[in-house]
Amino acid sequence: MKKRVLISFTFVVVIILILVFYIKIHNNKEEDVKINYDNIKHADIENIAQNYWNSDGIYNIAAAEDGYYYVTNEDFLVYFDINTGDTVPVCAKPDCMHDNDECNACLNTCVIYNIYYYNEYIYYMPIINGMANLCRMDKSGSTTKILGELFPSDGSSSIHLAFLGDYAYAYDSGSHLGLDTEFTEKIVEVSLKNGERNEIYDVTGVSLAIKNVKGFGDGLYFNVQHSERSDENISISSYGLYMYSQSEKNVSQISTENINDYYLSDNYLYYFINGQGLYKSDIENQKTELIYKSNKAVDMCNISYDGRYLYISNGKYCDYLRKVLGNKEKKYIVIDTDGKVINEISCADSLEMLFGDDRYLFCMGMGEDQLMYIDKREIEKAEEWKNIFSEPVHLLGR
């Protein structure tokens, strides 16, 4: 009986925490938002980095010219072509059978899941003597080069990368969020030419994380997020949107609003403010409008843009409010740049919502190597997900 009472009490406490969190988010009323346009109004936002992926999740997939790279559940890097159905390990070692950890495609000693494709090279982070390093691999997997050290890592840390010009930028997106110990969070810049390393930004505090780092034009944009938890309350908020200028070598604050995620394109800044919704700011004319309102099932959203439509994901929000919303409410909302809803696509069976490029929309299912996609040529009416792999990709010990 005591055990049953304890379980019931714990359940009630969890529900109260969730509801307080939900109410705190939605007490945020729509209001006039302030954007510092001075530092972004002349920005050339043409960019070749893959900012369309979900920068607040795992990076186990990267787009290439004709297909995609993917890290399997066995930590093997493979290349697949959706049109042909071909899947091959990314290794060109002579006589390699691709069935053990000596294979170049095996990434089991790296920061888990995170791979990137930039300017015709693959980038990942092997761990050497407890330190995550930046490594560059050619497209075939035949040659690799260590460019420089990043951060201490045990493999489970959430070190992410972003790219801009001739530099990679590394940051920890969540290892210390929710902890009671003070840490200094940093963004580290590494030259892709000579490996020179510089710390361009740092912030010290309890339960902080640098999030959603993306490069546009001359600027590297990012959030700083903070969480607080007590017996009665839990809150997650953003300190705003920041930009590091490569040319000026300084950091400025673009907004102090509670921005969860953002995207820049075609002289517009799109950003989602928690408790309010998705805003669109005209950088040239300095005008802002709310184009999509948040609601009880869609908030704290991540966003992406493929040159045609904006994509809104409520996956993180559903994860935080799992007891209230759960996976059944997970979805992508596809809207045009004026806020008109084009489609809503259920992601009830997804573990991770990845976004995608201009060809396909992706998510990770609950099963092993259950990478699923929707062809964006059918995005206006799409409802059902298709599996990339007919079965788990097992290479070890074949």
Where are these regions (language model features)?
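Loop/turn-rich, solvent-exposed surfaces of beta-rich toroidal or solenoidal domains
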Residues: 298-326, 330
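Residue position within the beta-strands of beta-propeller blades
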Residues: 70-71, 123-125, 169-172, 221-224, ...
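N-terminal export/targeting and maturation segments
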Residues: 30-76, 216, 262-265, 270
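Surface-exposed loop/turn elements that mediate protein-protein interactions on large endomembrane-trafficking
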Residues: 26-54, 76-102, 130-151, 178-203, ...
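Repeated scaffold domains used in trafficking and secretory/extracellular systems
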Residues: 54-64, 99-116, 153-165, 205-217, ...
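Hydrophobic alpha-helical membrane-insertion segments, chiefly the h-region
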Residues: 14-24
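Fold-core signature of tandem repeat domains
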Residues: 122, 190, 220, 241, ...
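N-terminal Sec-pathway targeting helices
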Residues: 1-14
